[in-house]
Swiss-Prot record:
Record's protein name: Zinc finger protein 423 homolog
Any single Pfam family the record assigns to this protein: zf-C2H2
GO molecular function terms attached to this record: DNA binding; zinc ion binding
Function: Probable transcription factor that can both act as an activator or a repressor depending on the context. Involved in posterior spiracle development. Acts downstream of ems and cut in posterior spiracle development.
InterPro entries listed in its UniProt record: Znf_C2H2_sf, Znf_C2H2_type
Disordered: region residues: 30-105, 306-331, 438-483, 758-778, 817-848, 1138-1228
Amino acid sequence: MMALKMLYRGPSSRLENLIEKIQATKEITNNDMYSTHTSSSYSPSISDGTMTPNSHHLIGAPTAAGQEDHPTEGKINGGADGEDLPKPKRLPHFHHHHHHHYHHQQALKIANKLRKINKEAKMGATAGGGATGAASKFDKLTGEGIKSRGDGSYQCQFCEKTFPRLGYLKHHVQSHAEHLPFKCEYCSKLFKHKRSRDRHKKLHTNERNYKCPHCEAAFSRSDHLKIHMKTHDIQKPFQCSMCNRGYNTAAALTSHMQKHKKNAAILAAGGNPNALNYSPRSTGSASASVSSNGSLQKRRYALALASDSSPSRMDFPKRSRSNHVGGTTTTATPTPLLRCSYCPKVTEFSSLEQLNAHLQSVHEQPQTQAVKTPVQEGEGFQLSCEYCTMKFGNIAGLFQHMRSTHMDRLSSPNSYYEHFNRLATAGTFSPRLALDLPKIKPDLGSPERESRPAEDDLPTDLSNNKRRPLTPNPQAQTPLAPPSAPPGVFFCNQCNAGLPDFESFRNHLKSHIAEGMQLVCPHCGMSLPEQSEFERHVVGHFLITGSEFNCSSSCGKSFAKSEDLQQHLLSEHVLTLLKCSLCSELCESRMAMQLHLACAHSQETKLLRCSACLELFRSDAEFHVHVKTRHQLGGHPTLGATSSAPTNPLQCMFCRAVCSSELEMHFHLAAHARQFRCPSCPETFHVEFLLDRHMQSQHGGVKDKEANSPNMGSLYVNALLPPLAAAAAAAAATNNNSSIIDYNVAFKGLFGGASGGAGSGGGGAQSGGAPPSANKFYSPLQVDTNALKAQTSPHPALMYGLSQRYLMEMYAAKSTSPSGNEGVGNSQPPAPQATAPPPPPNASTATFSCGMCERQDLRSEAELHSHRKLAHNLKTGVSLRCAYCAGNFKSRAELEQHMKSCHNSTGKHKCLICDEVFPSPAILAEHKLQHSKVGQSGKCSHCGQPLEDVAAFRAHLSEHGSDGASLPLACICCRQTLHSEFELSLHAKFHTKSSSSGGSLQEPVCALCLEPLPDATEGPAKLCDKCCRKHNLNGKRGKHSEPATSLPAPPSAFVENRCNLCKMILPHAQKLQEHLVEHTFAGTEQRGFNCYICSAVFTAPGGLLNHMGEHGAHSRPYDCNLCPEKFFFRAELEHHQRGHELRPQARPPAAKVEVPSIRNTSPGQSPVRSPTIVKQELYETDTVESAGVEDEPENHPDEEEYIEVEQMPHETRPSGIGSQLERSTSSA
C-alpha cells in the first residue's frame, strides 16, 4: 500500500519545476535547430480549435466524473493492513502524472548520457585521440557547436577588458566613475551623457511629456512619438485592397497580403475565426525569452538554469513511423518505463493507464465501471505533427497548427495536401474504428481479457527510435498471471525509483553517490570529478584573454597595438646618425654636428676696416700698406705755420679706433657724442635737425627752438681745427652747457684781418685783410677763402660743407637784422634785466651720481656720461636707463631683459577690459585710467582717507602693506594692477587731481621732462631750470615771465575743432571726426578700418564714417552719461566727455596784450613796416585760450609759438601782400 501511495501521490512543486525547466530547454533547442522566425512558444488551446492529448483528457474528465455513480472500496489482495484504495475521482489526473513522470525519466536519461560522455572524454584525453569523438557527441547532444572563446565577447570602451556577456559589461562600466559624471538620483546609476541620465529618470518618474495630437497616446521620448505619428499618416502610397490599410513600402504591403492569404486558407480549412489574428512571428513566452541569436555562452547558461542536466532535442528519439513493407506492418516495441510492484518480472507497462488497469484487474477486487472512460468517436483517429510532438484528432486541427506554428517550413500552402498524403503513406497515423477500441469489462477481477492487441491501449511513445509493427506482439498479448507471492521492492529515496532486488538497488545508489561527488560548475553546469579540474574550469570562466606587444629591450614597455610598438622602437631604439659631407664623420645629435662644424670646418678671418675710407682688409700687412700709402701725413701740407704732421697715430679712448689725424679723431669723437636727446623718449641724435624732425614725426610737434640765439648747437664744429675746438669749448663753458657750442666763437678765426667793421653801403664787401670789430663778424662775402684753404684738412669736401652751412646760417641771421644795409650785428641781444630771473643758487653746486657705482661727485651730465664710458666701458651713446622705473643698467642686454620681464615691452599691448591694442606699455597705462570707476576721487578704497597729492598717495600706499612689496601691486584707489613705477606715478597723479586748485586739473609740470615744477608761484613757465640750462633757454624763460605780470594764466578752455585727447586742432569738423576714428584704430591702421557691426573694411577713416551712417543712429553703442548724445566709437565719447569738462571753465577773451616778437629789433628802433610773410607753427600745449573772434587767434603766454620772418625783395614781392601785412602789423 505504501508503494501505491508513492506512485499515486499528486503533482508536487518539485516535479512541476522540473517539467518547466525541461520545456524551456526544448524550446531553446527548437529555436536553435529551426529558423529564428519560428515561434516555438505557441501553445494551442481549446479556444483556437486545436485538440491536444491533454485537451482530450480534460474534456473527458467531467464525463468520467459524472458517470461515477457507484464508487466502491476494496482491499488489495495480499495486503494485511487493509488500507483503502484511492478514490476514482483522481482519475482525470492520470495523464498529467504520466506527462510529468515521462519527462522526469527523460531528464534522468539525459543526465546519465552527460556523465557517460564526460567519462569517455576523460578517458580519451588520457589515451589521446578520443577528445574529438566526445566533443562531437556533446555537440550532438546539445545541438550546439562549441565556438571559440573570442566569439560574442564585449569590450569595454574605457579599458581593454572584454566580457562574454553584455550584462557583465554593463556592470563593469559602472566602475568607471571618472568617465560617467552623471548619476541617477533614484537608483545611483552612472551615465556618460546628461541626456542618457534624463531619459533614464523618466523610467522612475513615468513622465510622458510627448503627447500625440491625434489621439490620447503619450510617450517619454520624442523618437517614439515620431514612430507613433506614422500610424496617423494617411499619405501612404501602398493601400491594401481588403482592409484599406496604408503602407510606405511595397514590401510591407506584400507581407500584409500574406497574412490575408493565410487567414483565408485557415477559414477554408474550417479553422476557428478567433485564431486569425495570431501572428506566426510573434514574440515567445517568458520561458523562451532566450533568443537563439545570442552567443554560445548565453544559451549554455540559460540551459544550465533550466536543469542541472538539461536535455537537448537531439536526445529525444524521433517520432516512430509505421513502415508498410509487403503488406505487413512492423512497429518498434516501446521501452517499458513502469513495472508492477507485485509482479515486476512478469510484465512492464509504458503508461499509467495500463498500470492502473493491471492493478485493478489483477491485484484488487473488481470495481464496476471504475475506470471506464467514455470513448468518443473521433478519439481513435490521431494525426501527429511532423515538426513537433503534438497530435490532433482531425485534419483541420493539424492544418491550423501547421499554418500557425510551422508556416515557414513549407514552400506554399498547397503543399499541405502533399504533406498530408506523405504522412498517410508513411504510416504516421492509423485510423481506427470505434469497434477496435478497448473495452473494460465490469468484472475487472477476472484474469480473462478479450483477444486484442495490447499495443492499442498504449499511447504513442515518442522516446523510442525503433519502429514497432502494427501486428500485435504475441508475448504482449498473453494474459498477465498474478504471482504467487509478491517479492520485495526497493524504492530509492532520491528519485523514487522502484528496484526489484537489493543488487539493483545498490547499483542504483552508487549512481546517485557518484553524481553527488561530481563538482558542478555554477556558471555552465558542467560536472567535473576532480578538484583541480574544477578549479581550472572555474578560473577559465573569469579569464579574459588579450594580447599585448612588449618591447624586448630593457625599457619593459608594453603596447596594445603592434603599430604603437613599431613607433616606439623607431623613436626610442633607433639611433639616427648625422654624417658630415666634408669629412664623413658621424655625429649622434644635431648639436654634436653643429659643434663639429664649428670646430673642424669653421675658420674665423678678422676683417680690418679703415676708419677714414671704410675700406676692408683681411690681413695686417695690407692694412698697414694702405695707411702708409693713402693716409700718411708726411707729404701733406701742414695745418699751420708752426704745426707739423703727428708722428704717432691717435687712438679713440672709447672704441680703441686709430685715426691718422686730429681732425679725423674729432670726426670720430663726434660719432660717440649724441648729445641731442628727445625729451619725450630715450632717443638721442648727433644733429639738432634730426631731433627736430623726430619731434615732428613722432611726437606731433617740433622741439622748442630759440630763434634769437646765435648759438648753433651742432657738434660738427669739433671737426674743425684744434684751436677752433678749444675756442668752442671755452665758449660753451661760459654758458655752463657742454653740449652747446657757439659757432661765432668757433668760426672767428676763419675770417682774416685784425680791424675793420661792418660795411654801411647795403652789404658792400670790405677788404679781406680788415679785421672785424670786437662784437661783429664780417659779411659772409668777405670771408678769406685763402686762409680757409690754407687750413683745409685732408677732407676738403667735408670742410666745404661745414663752411657752407655756417655761411647759410649767418646769412639767415643777417636777413633778420633790424636794418638791411648794415652788417651782421651781435646775435646775442641784451636780455631785459628786470625780467631775467637770477640763476638758481644751487646751479653751480649741483652734482650728479652714477647709478652703477658709488661715485656722486660728478658736476655735470656730460661728466657723468664720460665717467660711464671710461669707468664702465659703455661703448654706445644710447641711454641705459629704463623709461618706466628709472632703473640704470650696465648693458643694453640687461636693459632689454628688464623690459621683457618687468614691463612686457615686446609685441602688442592689449587692454584686458576692452581688448584694445596699443603700441607701448605707457600708452596702455594711460588708457587704463579711462576704465577707472572711482575717477579722480582721491580717496583710498580701503579706509576712505582723502589723498591730497602724490606724496600723500605714496605715503598712504605703505600703510596698507604695499610699500616694500614688489611690482605688480594694486592701486589703493581703483584696485587696478600697476606693473611699473611709471604706471604707479601715473595713477598717483590721476587720483590726486583736485578741482579746487584754481580750476586746474593738472599740477604744473615741465613741458620737456614731464617732471613737476618745484614752485608754481614763479610764473606760468612750463620749463624747469634743468631743461632751461640744458637747452640754453634762459632768455626765453625771462620773456615768459614778463607778460605774466599783466595777464594771469587762464585755465584750460574749450576750442572748437580741437581734439581733446591729443590737443591737435583740425581745420573743420569732418577732419576732427576722421581724426577721432584714427584714435580708435591707433596701432592697427595697417590692417584697415573695419566696421564692428558688419565687418566691412575701409582704407580711410572717411569711408568708415560714411558707412557707419548707413547703420542708423540706433546702432551707436556709446552714450554720454551727461547728455543724450550717442557715438559710434569710444574715442568720440572720450572727446565729448572732456569737452563737458572744458566748456564750463571757458572765459571771455582777454584783452589783447602786445608781446614783443621773438626776433625783435634793437632798442630805439621802430618796428619794421615792410611787408613780411609770417609762418605760424602750433605746438602741443596744455592750455589754449578760446578765441573770441574766429579769424583772430590770441597769443597766450603759456603757448609756445615759433614765428619765422623772411625778408623778401621789393621787386619780387606780390602786390597786395605788403598792404595786408602792414595793416595786420599796425593793428597788432
